[in-house]
């Protein structure tokens, strides 16, 4: 559940602990009347500082555009530096995270961006770009068609991040060597 919904108490209170992941996704993220759906779809608009292009940036990230130039191309913006400021604002608010390859720490062109919030990452990967299909198909058929085939890969990314963090903590605390 964490890979999809994250750790927010607000979101986790809306989940049914007895339900499967599929059932919770259908009842919350795919239900336009649920507080979880409203949270994911309206978060950007709650803070005007984040509003400018944020939704379009999230959409680009949800479509596997991870590098700055890929985001820039997806948005079709001119190279004025405004996008860099917007990404910095989203990174400062911890909505986006920036990763730099360990072997190229000073190469900004190799940096990638991702949505930090698992729920937003899920929403912009599967739901946002397919909202009309959700309305036509209904939640269950939408899940089976758009989410189920890719869910394992989506969850794997979060699992890899958790494993990396675990080993990093083990090495820093001196409990593990040679990693």
List the predicted regions and their residue ranges:
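A short helix-loop-helix "switch/interaction" segment in the helical subdomain of ASCE P-loop NTPases
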Residues: 1-12
């Amino acid at each position: 559940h964490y890979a999809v919904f994250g750790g927010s108490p607000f979101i986790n209170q809306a989940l049914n602990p007895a339900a499967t992941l599929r059932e919770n996704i259908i009842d919350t993220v795919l239900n336009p009347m649920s507080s979880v759906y409203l949270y994911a779809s309206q978060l950007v608009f709650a803070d005007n500082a984040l509003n400018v292009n944020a939704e379009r940036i999230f959409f680009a990230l949800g479509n596997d555009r991870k590098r700055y130039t890929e985001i820039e191309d997806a948005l079709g913006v001119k190279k004025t530096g405004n996008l860099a400021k917007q990404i910095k604002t989203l990174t400062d608010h911890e909505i986006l995270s920036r990763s730099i390859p360990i072997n190229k720490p000073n190469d900004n062109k190799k940096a990638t961006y991702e949505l930090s919030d698992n729920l937003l990452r899920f929403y912009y990967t599967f739901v946002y770009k397919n909202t009309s299909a959700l309305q036509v198909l209904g939640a269950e058929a939408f899940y089976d068609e758009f989410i189920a085939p890719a869910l394992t890969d989506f969850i794997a990314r979060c699992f890899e991040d958790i494993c990396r963090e675990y080993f990093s903590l083990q090495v820093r605390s001196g409990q593990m060597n040679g990693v």
